[in-house]
Amino acid sequence: MENDKVVGLVKKISEERDEGAFSQIFDFIAPKINAYLIKNNLNIEQAEELTQEVLSTIWIKAKLFNPEKSKFTTWAFTIAKIKK
């Protein structure tokens, strides 16, 4: 997914609480976060639970994402690293 599209989806989440936009973000980033967590020594259950926490944080804090400072994937993985 192109960064411009992702930025637009995150903006919809932050401004409109758009569940459809969140669903697209979820489908895009959840498998990547989950794989990252498993690669970093979490078991499948722990990785799935933490992935849910990361996505929940993205939903709650979408307005804090600044596309001028980082790409969305960088921001999402930073959240995962902090929660890990």
Regions of interest found by a model, annotated:
Residues 14-15, 42, 55-69:
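Sigma70-family region 2
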Residues 22, 26-33, 55, 77, ...:
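Hydrophobic alpha-helical core bundles mediating ligand binding, dimerization, or RNAP-core interactions
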Residues 27, 52, 67:
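Phosphate-coordinating loops and pocket residues in cytosolic domains that bind phosphorylated ligands
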Residues 33, 37-40, 58, 62, ...:
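Hydrophobic recognition helices of helix-based DNA-binding modules
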